[in-house]
Every structure is written in structure tokens, then in C-alpha cells.
Amino acid sequence: MKDLRYPIGQFTYVGTITEEIIDKWIQEIEDLPNELARAIKDLDQKQLDTPYRVGGWTVRQVVHHVVDSHMNSYIRFKLAMTEKNPTIKPYKEEKWAELPDSKLPVDVSLVMLDSLHKRWVNLLYSLEPADLEKTFNHPESGETKLAAAIGLYAWHGRHHTAHITSLRERLNW
């Protein structure tokens, strides 16, 4: 049985990150709000409150987490664009997933995600090759170039969408 935590595998990229790859990743980030909305379409409240795996987050928490994570990423990009290798602040995503706003209707986060991604994608398409080399420093994972971060967050959106779609497949929803 495959690892339900990583339905599309973990993020890895080896090789040169070309303009074509960057464009593909940005397109995936742009598509995420619609893909995530499609993944949860017609789910009822009980289904939204079903964990995607034993010990995992509920579908509702996954949707809210994606927005939390991508808001943080958007800020990290802006920091890297305006400061030299800023040290970003990590957050405890597992604790954020337990906060009261993670019980709100998923539509709240879908609207936020759509608006956030419109702004983020606009910023991403404006990046010049030199901008893609800019970095931020994560206290736990170290220095990250913006080019690689684009790939990581494209993967992140697909990863969590796959949590939901694979659950739907397993349970015949």
C-alpha cells in the first residue's frame, strides 16, 4: 500500500530549473484554486470532516491548511524580493490546524485562496531570472532560492489536492 501521507510522492527536483519548468509550476499554482474546489465539490459536512488518513487532517483542515501555507509562502516571496536572504518565521502548522478558524466552512478558504493566488501568480510572472536566484532562509531547512520555492509550492498544492482526491477514490465518493 502506498504512503497515504504522500500520494504523489515527496517533492524532489534534480537538474536545472528552466524557464519552461518555472512556467509549468506557476501554471499549477494558478490552477490550484479551481483544482482544490473541484476536489471537494459536492462533499457533505460529514465527508469534509473525515480525515484523509488515520491520524491525518480532515478534508476541511487540509483546505484551510493550504491557504495558511500559501499565505506564508506569498509573504516569504515578498520578503525575499525586498530584503537580502531574510530569515523567515516558521509556523506550527499542526497547531494552526487545531485553531477555531479551521472549523469554518471551506468556502471561506476557497475564496481566500483564489484571491491570494491571483496576487501571487501576478508576482511570480513578474520575476526576472535574477529574481529567481533570490533566497530566503528557513531556520529549519536552510536557504531556499525562489525558483525552487515555486516548485515546492506547486507540488504542495497538488500534494494536498491528491490527499482529497485519493480519499474520494478509496471511499467511492
Curated annotation (Swiss-Prot):
Cystines in this chain: none
Major location (coarse): cytoplasm
Keyword set, alphabetical order: Cytoplasm, Hydrolase, Metal-binding, Zinc
A molecular function (GO) term: hydrolase activity
Cofactor(s) it depends on: Zn(2+)
InterPro entries noted in UniProt: DinB-like (IPR024775), DinB/YfiT-like (IPR034660), Put_metal_dep_hydrolase_YfiT (IPR023774)
The keyword Transferase appears for this protein: no
EC identifiers of the protein: 3.-.-.-
Binding residues for Zn(2+): 65, 156, 160
Domain of life, per lineage: Bacteria
GO cellular component, one term: cytoplasm
Location relative to the cell: Cytoplasm
Bound cofactor: record note: Binds 1 zinc ion per subunit.
Similarity-based family: Belongs to the metal hydrolase YfiT family.
Function per UniProt: Possible metal-dependent hydrolase.
Subunit: Homodimer.
NCBIfam families: PRK13291.1 (NF009807)
The protein's name in its UniProt record: Putative metal-dependent hydrolase BcerKBAB4_2443
Natural source organism: Bacillus mycoides (strain KBAB4)
